[in-house]
């Protein structure tokens, strides 16, 4: 099977997420379609899957031909608006497999990987105007510093930001290898350091944190009582957001209580501990190694 099509934590998703075999489920990150296809196989003839993806490559590569399935090119932050196209207001379950797909990281022209010399792009939706090249060459010192701290928790963010500004005055920074060459003074563990830099840029390019918050808020709104939401994250920055929201229904992580001390959080965590992929899956699928799954159910 092509790595593009290997779904992460599939058994766990099917076990926890599918509560109603006649229900309507949303796959907010279609990717190669592995999760969507498996959900369809789990559901009855009356069940339905609606999938979203902002990457045109994912849309073009879809090979699921099933009357119970619909695929829409859009950012998952618009989930609430888009399901109205199908005259829907509530759904039985929602799946979000966050982060970058194997297809994107392994596509040399997309600029996501430190392995390939390509244009600094990093757009998941290639119709967007802003790419990583624009950010590197146009952001101010403060803007660069803040995104490195917020989205990568990068050490030496001050010096790195200053060095980027210094080099871009001399020459426009075009490619991934241009940037890596500039940064070679800073890293001891090359892959780990550069991955954090690239992660910071990718999150900024795709507005991933704000999109995630929109997704979570809208998911809570359209999830029917007793419906479930499953979120797979790949780094601590997005996982902290997911953890707080699924536990409390807000982003400050404070559980709301009424005057009698009753917990007013709209969701219940089905598994209080983080769900990780098995040792066997980690051997077969590299992407699953950093995967963190959290699942919650909307209170009835």
Swiss-Prot record:
Pfam short name (any one): Methyltransf_5
Catalytic activity: cytidine(1402) in 16S rRNA + S-adenosyl-L-methionine = N(4)-methylcytidine(1402) in 16S rRNA + S-adenosyl-L-homocysteine + H(+)
Chief place of localization: cytoplasm
Regions annotated as coiled coil: none
Subcellular location: Cytoplasm
Ligand binding (S-adenosyl-L-methionine): 33-35, 53, 78, 97, 104
Listed EC numbers: 2.1.1.199
GO molecular function, one term: rRNA (cytosine-N4-)-methyltransferase activity
EC class: transferase
Single Gene Ontology BP annotation: rRNA base methylation
Gene Ontology CC terms: cytoplasm
Swiss-Prot/TrEMBL keywords: Cytoplasm, Methyltransferase, rRNA processing, S-adenosyl-L-methionine, Transferase
UniProt similarity note: Belongs to the methyltransferase superfamily. RsmH family.
Function of the protein: Specifically methylates the N4 position of cytidine in position 1402 (C1402) of 16S rRNA.
HAMAP family in alphabetical order: 16SrRNA_methyltr_H
Name recorded for this polypeptide: Ribosomal RNA small subunit methyltransferase H
Organism: Karelsulcia muelleri (strain GWSS) (Sulcia muelleri)
